[in-house]
Amino acid sequence: MRLSVFWFLPTHGDGKYLGTNEGARPVDHAYLQQIAQAADRLGFGGVLIPTGRSCEDAWLVAASLIPVTQRLRFLVALRPGVISPTQAARQAATLDRLSNGRALFNLVTGGDAEELAGDGVFLDHGERYAESAEFTRVWRRVLEGETVDYKGKHVHVRGARLMFKPVQQPRPPLWFGGSSEVAQDLAAEQVDVYLTWGEPPAQVKEKIARVQAKAAARGRKVRFGIRLHVIVRETNDEAWQAADRLISHLDDQTIAKAQAALARTDSVGQQRMAALHGGKRDRLEISPNLWAGVGLVRGGAGTALVGDGPTVAARMQEYADLGIETFILSGYPHLEEAYRVGELLFPHLELNIPEVPKPAAVQAHGEHVAHDFAPQKVPQGER
C-alpha cells in the first residue's frame, strides 16, 4: 500500500529545542512559506495547520499559501461552537475553490475548558461532542448541495445552503481525532478519516478495531491516519542523540508546569498521551523506536519515531499493517527536518504523491440577483 505522508506548519512557534527560547526562531509568513514550499517539492501530500489560541489562524495561513504551492493540500480546523456550520461550509467551499480542490478539514472539539470559555464555549465534554455531531450533520449536507432545515439541541438552521459549490465532490474530506467513546461514535457516523496520536501499535490497533466496528454497524467505512513527530538521521545512534538534544535544555520545573497545564484538559486523548511518560524523563522509549519526550511539554501529539531511514520506515509499516494510510509527521525545526525526512526516510517508503490538480471548470453566471439566486440565461432567440 502506498502511504500518504503529510507535514506540519508550526504556527505556534518553532526552534531547535523544546521548553526553552534557546534556538528559537521567528515564525513569520516568509518562514511558513519556506516550509510549505519545501513540503510541496519534497513529495509530502499535505500539511496540518494547528488551531487554538497559541496558533496563528489556520484558515488565513492556508489561504495565504495556496498561491505559492502547487500540489500541497491544507488540513485546517473546523471549530463547532465557535462558528456556525453554514458559515463554516461557505468558508470550506471557498477555500476548496481557491485551492483548486486542495482543501481538507479537521473537526476539532477542543479539550481545554479555560481556552474554550475564552471562545464563548461553556459545554462539558459530552455536550461538546453532541454539538459537534449536530454541527457536522449540517456542515456536510450544506457542502453536498442540500438546502437544510435542522433543529437540534445545539444547532438550529432554516434554509441553509451554498451558492458556490466546492471543487471536490460531493464535498472535501472530513478528518477527526478523538479517543473517548463519544468521539469514536462521531467518527464512525460522520467522518472520512479518523486520526489517532502516536500511541504504541497495540493501542492503535485497539482504537482502529473499535472505530471499524462502530462504522460497520452504521454501514460505513472509515480511513485511518496517525499524527507523529519524527527524528530521522543517517544512523540510529545519531537519531537518539538528536532526541536527547531536543530536550537537553528542559528543566524539571518546566516539565511540571507543562504537565499541570495539560492536566486540566478533559481530552481523553491528552490523558492517554500523558500516561505514556507520566511526566518523567527516565523511560521515554515506550515502544521500539517510539519516544515520548515531546509530550513532556507539548500538548497534543507527544511521541516521535526515532531512528535511521530504514528503521523509521519499518515502524511506519507496522502502523500501516494495522490500517493506517496517512502519516502526519513533524520535527524540530520544521524546515530542516522536512528535508531530512525527504532525503533519509522517503527513499524507504512507497509514497502516494498527489499530482498537480488540473484547473477546475468554473461556470460564468454573472452577479447573483438580490443576493439570492443566479441570473437566468437569455434565450437563444432573444440575444
From Swiss-Prot:
Domain of life: Bacteria
Keyword Secreted carried by entry: no
GO molecular function, one term: alkanesulfonate monooxygenase activity
Enzyme class: oxidoreductase
Record-listed E.C. numbers: 1.14.14.5
Reaction it catalyzes: an alkanesulfonate + FMNH2 + O2 = an aldehyde + FMN + sulfite + H2O + 2 H(+)
Keywords annotated in UniProt: Flavoprotein, FMN, Monooxygenase, Oxidoreductase
Subunit organization: Homotetramer.
Family membership noted in the UniProt record: Belongs to the SsuD family.
Additional detail: FMNH(2) which is absolutely required for this enzymatic reaction, is provided by SsuE.
Protein name, as recorded: Alkanesulfonate monooxygenase
Lineage: Bacteria, Pseudomonadati, Pseudomonadota, Gammaproteobacteria, Enterobacterales
Gene name for this UniProt entry: ssuD
